Amino acid sequence: KTIEQTMEKLTDGARRLAAQLTTTASFDSLWSVLTDYDRLNLFIPNLLSSKKIFRNETNLHVRQVGSQDFLGLKFSAEVLLDLYEEKENGLIKFNLIKGDFRKFEGYWKIQSISNTGKNSLIYDLTVKGCQWMPIGMIEKRLKRDLSDNLIAVERQAKLVS
């Protein structure tokens, strides 16, 4: 599976990571998987829980807990995210309300690739760790996780279509 990735070091110590996957999964199945917030932890690796706690017309709040084994230690982090859905543009933006990161924001985007019957699935994340979580130490892990997340979403989308 070919995944294009970029990683950028930002001036404030944050990292911006982006990953893109081309898939034959349909827009509707990808959208349905990405917006099934209460079940994301069932197929996204290292996501222990995901729970929608508020929703109105365009915004929702989701609490998520992720877990990692890093250098033999189990590490978990919690985030409360504000999400904004634009289905007509295939876009889900997210911003940190509060949590174990100083910054955790970005978007998921589904884009159709002209004349191919395929879609591009993009995950773009800007993240800044806390004092006890130096981002430089975990950036390789984050890059791998972004790829794993894309593959997991694609696999689930093909199952539901």
Regions found by a protein language model. Give the residues of each.
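A general secondary-structure signal for short beta-strands and their flanking turns/coil
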Residues: A14-R16, E57-N59, S76, K103, ...
